[in-house]
């Protein structure tokens, strides 16, 4: 499934294409997509395919096409502080993007059938926290993953504000999914080859809307134990953050706000991700001449075409010159502020989430 937009050269290029095709429509979703490099969730040797609008599968590891994830993120209408459940959380790519929007006071849970994929997701999550330049630019709701079949969730489990299911849902499982949703919540899942948004408007009332034609593998049916019944799966607890963690969140937030105020006072704009300049397409002006009794179009270069060619050459030269300049190391102002605080080194390390950069 996918192929709706052109392939990108890198993550930013892919996001530009998704925006241009109207799959990404809101700034909040765009920021989350730019912050998480899709290529980081591919196995070594397969990264070249990361920026194509195509699904990817290797063994139990699976990523949906970027256009699908874009529609899902937009349809969920995420807000800070909400609770989210990802049914079939896979590599954790979607859950990590969701966590950037939910912020530190949200709930971010995922359930995945394959234990090796859960381990893969945890490794990718740890790598994002430790190594990504984007981590310090957001307040993050870290996903918690459990192994299990999403059709075996314990009946006394809590409900969620937002739910996504990444596998095809049969009609007879639709109500099971709906019960997991809070009143006022949104559930996005594929039903009968349609990605569907379901809103719970009351205790027993729902509104549904088809978003996109899709093709998903169906949910795996649960296996039964010796008693002939499937074992139930417990979801992660909705834990309250401790005071130490809350202090870290608020210290980092205060420093980040201070940095933003400083930059505004100096007239320094917040750095936006680089956008690629697309070459303008050369257009032709046609003249028409009669040949016998037929009117034949004859292409004629316009002055505007010549100017476009000159502009494109100038842009290529400028891009080449920029590429030849030595890259400046990225500046992490939040880290710099933390390291200047009059605190023991162990506390500074805690405030930086033990990141090395």
From Swiss-Prot:
Q: Into which family does the record put it?
A: Belongs to the methyltransferase superfamily. L-isoaspartyl/D-aspartyl protein methyltransferase family.
Keyword Electron transport carried by entry: no
The main location class comes to cytoplasm
Q: Subunit details for this protein?
A: Component of the probable ECS(PCMTD1) E3 ubiquitin-protein ligase complex, at least composed of CUL5, ELOB, ELOC, RBX2 and PCMTD1. Interacts (via the BC-box) with ELOB and ELOC; the interaction is direct and stabilizes PCMTD1.
Recorded topology in the membrane: Lipid-anchor
- Could you tell me which residues are lipidated, with the kind given as N-myristoyl glycine? 2
Record's Pfam families?
A: PCMT
* Protein name in UniProt: Protein-L-isoaspartate O-methyltransferase domain-containing protein 1
The family database entries (Gene3D superfamilies) matched by this protein are listed as:
Vaccinia Virus protein VP39
Instruction: Note down the stretches annotated as region BC-box.
Output: 240-250
Show the segment(s) annotated as Disordered: 299-333
- What would you give as a GO molecular function for this chain, any one? ubiquitin-like ligase-substrate adaptor activity
Please provide, in alphabetical order, the Gene Ontology terms of the cellular component aspect for this entry. Cul5-RING ubiquitin ligase complex; cytoplasm; membrane
**Subcellular location field:** Cytoplasm; Membrane
